[in-house]
Swiss-Prot record:
Residues 1-50 are annotated as: Required for homodimerization. Dual-function protein that regulates the transcription of class 2 flagellar operons and that also acts as an export chaperone for the filament-capping protein FliD. As a transcriptional regulator, acts as an anti-FlhDC factor; it directly binds FlhC, thus inhibiting the binding of the FlhC/FlhD complex to class 2 promoters, resulting in decreased expression of class 2 flagellar operons. As a chaperone, effects FliD transition to the membrane by preventing its premature polymerization, and by directing it to the export apparatus. Homodimer. Interacts with FliD and FlhC. GO terms for cellular component: cytosol. It is found in: Cytoplasm, Cytosol. Its main location: cytoplasm. The lineage of its organism: Bacteria, Pseudomonadati, Pseudomonadota, Gammaproteobacteria, Enterobacterales. Transmembrane segments: none annotated. One of its GO terms (biological process) is negative regulation of bacterial-type flagellum assembly. This is Flagellar protein FliT. The keyword Plastid does not apply. It comes from the Bacteria. It comes from Escherichia coli O139:H28 (strain E24377A / ETEC). Residues 60-98 are annotated as: FliD binding.
Amino acid sequence: MNHAPHLYFAWQQLVEKSQLMLRLATEEQWDELIASEMAYVNAVQEIAHLTEEIDPSTTMQEQLRPMLRLILDNESKVKQLLQIRMDELAKLVGQSSVQKSVLSAYGDQGGFVLAPQDNLF
């Protein structure tokens, strides 16, 4: 049985999934991006399985090469966008930790509320 057309179609589907993931990352739709990751991983596994079953001809490898380049470029861009997001989250966590420390240090004043008074004299 000739699996070459099925392999080519699987690569096309992987390109589509890769482009979807890049769009989701660009639009900062992080939950949707994470949800789409499993379909992407499954598509990669299917390609690996099909590639083991057949030995793609040199011609087919040449046809698949541009798709592989596009997928790798998209993956690189998604990783860059994810790194930016992780840096943003790390900054927010750091700010939250500082705020918690300040509240802990100054918020527990033995039940007294420390506030400036208008009329001291």
